[in-house]
Amino acid sequence: VASTSVPGAIERGGPLLIHHEQAVEGAEIPAASALALAALGPETPLALVVGVPNGPNRVLRPRGGKLEALPLTELADPFGTAHALAAADFDGDGVEEIWVANGDPGRTRGLCADRLFDPVGEGFRDLLAEPAAATLGSVPSSHTVRPLDRLGSGRYGFLAAGAGGPLRLVEQDGRAGLNDAAAEAGLDELVEGGAMACGPLLGRGLDVFVGAARGPSLLFQGAGLGRWVEVADTAGLAVADLGAVDAAILDADQAGTWGLLCLRRRGAHLLWIPDATGLLHERAPPTLARPSVATALLVADLDNDGFEEILIANAGEPNRLLAWREQGWRPIDPGDALEPASLPTAVAAADLDGDGRLEVVIARASGRGGGIGLYRVDAPEHAWLRVAPRTPQGAPARGALVRLVAGGRSQTRILGEGARGAGEPVAHFGLGAIEQVERLDIRWLDGSVRRLENLPARRTLIVPHPLAAGAAAREPA
């Protein structure tokens, strides 16, 4: 793909993303709707869970830079209608469970109830179908879902939004039963969920944005002690009909200013940045705001230059890639990931071959190459550091903040956010030409903090929670 195919693209030495031929081995996946990178076993490589709209769902393992399909299990759920995925350690055993949101935004009601798959041996069991879930009553299908550890205990709940009903926050109670804690948490508001994002938007606490596919959207400010207060109107987020499809809380100026980026199915995309009082102001530059039929969002440092890129996946029109250049978000050439005629549904980035460079996975409802597209980055060699914080139980600490200082400049990541699914639960930092990290700070959701200093680059660090036994940071075995 020539760089001239992207109007206004700045020169950076050629297209950034190159297509992998035969991305998936051992399975045909004609269509895909959601992606989740999950830790399905202790000390095992991350798996890529693929939601398939008409089943079966698949689990793929990275092998030699490609993706190898594992045998079908209960998670395949061939009669399901997967639309979104989330991954987190629900029961505190150090392994992540998978929530499958089986809602269909084109229908008032989903065809199939949601699932919560718990890895057991070589298979899975659906916790929502067991007697422990009886107190939940009927569990309808959802359109979007995110993990939420509201008490910082390492046991995550799942916050799910469906077709105009109240938000649900499904947690495991102290007796191993399941309950809906949304009312207790202050989250039981009505919404037709189209997008979710969690992070420290309005302060140091964990804030929750629920972008509505139709009707008013919600913004919950963390109030401490596992509770939230809805502040959309007072914070300046009163958009009557947002039409949200995906969202992320990101470093809006690559200098430490948090912002909320929301993609819309119609109308200009929006980037809200809070002022010192917590009032949000819309500040999307024209290059970012330009309307498109957006379906999914990815924010990651793809070329390891120390600045993140934004990939906007669009239905039936070219995908867009923006990079932070000359103190602003500028379009660059996505290369083979332009995909001008496909119908992308989700995007994820992960280091699948262990070389310190991210690969990009695009799920598609249709398009050339089937349901999964795999892309590698074509860019100059740069240094990097990858950080994998763990909960006290040893699972990925999704939602933790990781801040790095290298060459006098800081970068911050929120662990594990992803588009219509679960992102890689690793804080990936490009370092450009810098080979030494001065300082690394990790803040867990319970307020615990660890600092590591004078770290060499080009390595992955697993960082246990301070309360965990054997809490020294280490590289993967």
Region locations from a protein language model:
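Beta-propeller blade termini
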Residues: A32-G41, L46-A47, T81-E97, S141-L151, ...
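Blade-edge motifs of beta-propeller repeat domains
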Residues: V1-A31, L46-V49, R58-G80, R115-P140, ...
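Hydrophobic beta-strand segments that make up the repeating blades of beta-propeller
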Residues: L46-V52, I98-N102, Y156-G162, L206-A212, ...
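Short coil/loop residues immediately preceding or within conserved phosphate-binding loops
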Residues: A32, A82, L111, P140-S142, ...
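Short, solvent-exposed loop/turn segments at conserved positions within beta-propeller repeat blades
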Residues: N54-G55, R107-C112, G162-G165, A212-G215, ...
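Loop/turn-rich, solvent-exposed surfaces of beta-rich toroidal or solenoidal domains
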Residues: T295-V299, D303-G316
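Gly/Ser/Thr/Pro-enriched helix-cap/hinge segments flanking short amphipathic alpha-helices
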Residues: A2-A9, V24-E28, L280-E282, R290, ...
